[in-house]
Amino acid sequence: MSREPVPSSFDEGNPQFTEETGMQKFTRRLKEEPLVPLGCAATCYALYRAYRSMKSGDSVEMNRMFRARIYAQAFTLVALVAGGMYFKTERQQRREFDQAVELRKKQEKRDAWLRELEIRDKEDREWRERHAAIEAAAKEAGNKAAPRKEPEAARSSIEPADEKSIGVMDAVRALISRN
């Protein structure tokens, strides 16, 4: 089993769960309705020319540019409405596609989360089994290491006082009690 961390479905930077950036969306919208930015640019240009005319004191040119600004804004609105009517079915399809993509992303995220939970559960079970085996081996080793009662004839010639577990006072008492 590899020691790499399990990829989380909650990672925001995961490219698997990203769809369209803001710039991509802007360029797509610009391609869908190219007349709207053109109308906005014409409006800005008319306002700029009206400002320059006002600074120079030419009121006739300024009024003409303000009228041009109104025409440019009307053009922008007409382009927006016409584009909305023209791309209505395409936008509806796009909306359905976006909903399907969102549903797919949610399902993928849920599936990734479930896989992650299954992997973590499997690791947890393996860890418990390993530790249960280690504990069983330790108990078995503890049972083997426990001293067995040997018959008196099989005892070694070591005096009870010579055993390491008995202290000096206990050894003296044992010698006195024997006599």
Swiss-Prot record:
Gene Ontology CC: mitochondrial membrane
Superkingdom per UniProt: Eukaryota
Coiled-coil positions: 98-118
Record keywords: Coiled coil, Membrane, Mitochondrion, Transmembrane, Transmembrane helix
UniProt keyword Disulfide bond, yes or no: no
Main location: mitochondrion
Gene Ontology terms describing biological process: mitochondrial respirasome assembly
Record-annotated HIG1 domain positions: 7-98
Region (Disordered): 136-162
Cell location: Mitochondrion membrane
Basic and acidic residues bias locations: 136-153
InterPro entries xref list: Hypoxia_induced_domain, RCF1
Keyword Lipid biosynthesis appears in the UniProt entry: no
Membrane topology note: Multi-pass membrane protein
Transmembrane segments: 34-50, 70-87
Task performed by this protein: Cytochrome c oxidase subunit which plays a role in assembly of respiratory supercomplexes.
Protein family: Belongs to the RCF1 family.
Subunit comment: Associates with the respiratory chain complex III/complex IV supercomplex.
Name of this chain's protein: Respiratory supercomplex factor 1, mitochondrial
Species in which this protein is naturally found: Penicillium rubens (strain ATCC 28089 / DSM 1075 / NRRL 1951 / Wisconsin 54-1255) (Penicillium chrysogenum)
Gene from which this protein is expressed: rcf1
